[in-house]
Amino acid sequence: MVGIFDSGKGGAFALAELRKLRPDADAVFFADRKNAPYGTKSQETLVALAERDIGILRSFGADDILIACCTASTVYPLLSREHRRGVIPIIDATARAAVRSSKNKRIGVLATELTVRSGAFETAIRNHCKDAEVSSVSVQRLVFAIENGGSTDESVEDALRSLGDIDTVILGCTHFAAIEEKIKKEGLAAVNSARIGAELLSERVKSGSGITLYINE
């Protein structure tokens, strides 16, 4: 059994990507809607929530767990050793994919307030390409729009203008899988963190019956 957690729809996007790769995976998905959004929480609160979420998924039999949330992934190094066991963050793998995708090494990051403030994507990108130019924009209102089924057009346009001259955009919140095609229509490469996470998790899947348990709070 594998597990996935997020505060909302972003985790559902990751689960959908996992199903494309491994329809036989037995999975449990926890959506912590009670504490959504994670992107505005303090670091201390986020550590507590992430460790609790991991514990919940393990209680349902999950051995390998995807943090399907870039914001929660920023505090992965702060989790206890026991809570890090078998847990997959998505910042570094997403940054690596962006560096590989970018031709001019000018990379934009669309993310939540806490993720941008942490500088996690910038650090990870430069670990893979020290000369990369990185622009980051916090688009918290875009998270709300996607979570509540609202229009994303204006937020996407404003965010892309703020990012400037780039050729690759990291969708640095798994919710932003919803705007991947809009980014591509602007002639930019879009790196989908939900898909990257699902690919990482799929490598740990043991063949099962394809059941999914949904936990909501």
Annotate each language-model stretch with its function:
Residues 1-217:
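Non-catalytic structural scaffold of enzyme domains
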